[in-house]
Amino acid sequence: MHFLQNAVVAATMGAALAAAAPLEKRSCTFTSASAAKSGKSSCSTITLDNIAVPAGETLDLTGLKKGTTVIFEGETTFGYKEWKGPLISMSGTDITVKQASGAKINCDGARWWDGKGSNGGKTKPKFFQAHKLDQSSITGLKVYNTPVQGFSILADHLTITDVTIDNSAGTSKGHNTDAFDIGQSTYITIDGATVYNQDDCLAINSGEHITFTNGYCDGGHGLSIGSIGGRSDNTVNDVTISNSKVLNSQNGVRIKTIYGKTGTVENVKFEDITLSDISKYGIVVEQDYENGSPTGTPTNGVKVEDITFKKVTGSVKSSGTDIYILCGSGSCSNWTWSGVDVTGGKKSSKCKNVPSGASCSD
């Protein structure tokens, strides 16, 4: 009798374990956004096969199981609607995101582009919300024509490698098509990004231990820290931006802070940056932004300290300015300036409170 009872218990437990096992190692292929949303929690490998996301909906990959791999296959597309988005949202821990050979994510942003970006006109959806995508990686995605901003990053230990964002079709009407916006994040690495856009290639609004390297930025507003000030988190610390090219852009490298606000920008390195055909500023540090525009009057509430400009070289158009530094009184300090050679534009006569070692006339 005891043997029979034990056998029944063992059989029951075995059946339960067998039923549970597929949930731990299940590979799933989804062909619709709704199927992905409803089925994602039971999958350890998710293949998104030629998904057409309906208008006004998000490809919802939030709350993924730890260790999930997500593969974009074929062409991912999105229906048209005026809304804020995002088109894709993803969260989880130890997530691997990649694409199959020949795959692409086609946002078809031209349907929204009206030259106004996020400042009016049509309401445009942001592209990819990587919030709480921790200890994870995104590799090799090819993204075309985002309506406005690209990757919104609020994460810890996220590595993005060899991602292409091609908004070159938006040269005339695309606007605010930032590639990577980072806030309240730690240990973010972006390596080998290729970007054609109409706004910042990189914008760091807050965060620590951030690396951007081997980037290629064409057509936008350059590599930016800020704007800093007026947010819940106004600290940027330990940032390295290196071995990158900025071409045909409004700015090369930039730090901008908000007029009358407080915060800290420290331990930031711009190293081995090559500039070409920059239209406005090769190197620019401004502490006078108010309502999104410079005022010409800097304030010193945001400290800009321990900043390195090393081997930042290249050309500015004759209508532009090589270097512009507008610091508040005593707020910019302990800068390292070496191998800087930016030429072709004007020399600014409006620089203020330039820290020792730096120069507006190099």
Curated annotation (Swiss-Prot):
Protein name: Endopolygalacturonase B
EC code(s) of this entry: 3.2.1.15
UniProt keyword list: Cell wall biogenesis/degradation, Disulfide bond, Glycoprotein, Glycosidase, Hydrolase, Repeat, Secreted, Signal, Zymogen
Role according to the record: Involved in maceration and soft-rotting of plant tissue. Hydrolyzes the 1,4-alpha glycosidic bonds of de-esterified pectate in the smooth region of the plant cell wall.
InterPro entries to which the protein is assigned, alphabetical: Glyco_hydro_28, Glycosyl_hydrlase_28, PbH1, Pectin_lyas_fold, Pectin_lyase_fold/virulence
Summary of pH dependence: Optimum pH is 5.0.
UniProt source species: Aspergillus niger
Taxonomic lineage: Eukaryota, Fungi, Dikarya, Ascomycota, Pezizomycotina
Catalytic activity reported: (1,4-alpha-D-galacturonosyl)n+m + H2O = (1,4-alpha-D-galacturonosyl)n + (1,4-alpha-D-galacturonosyl)m
GO MF: polygalacturonase activity
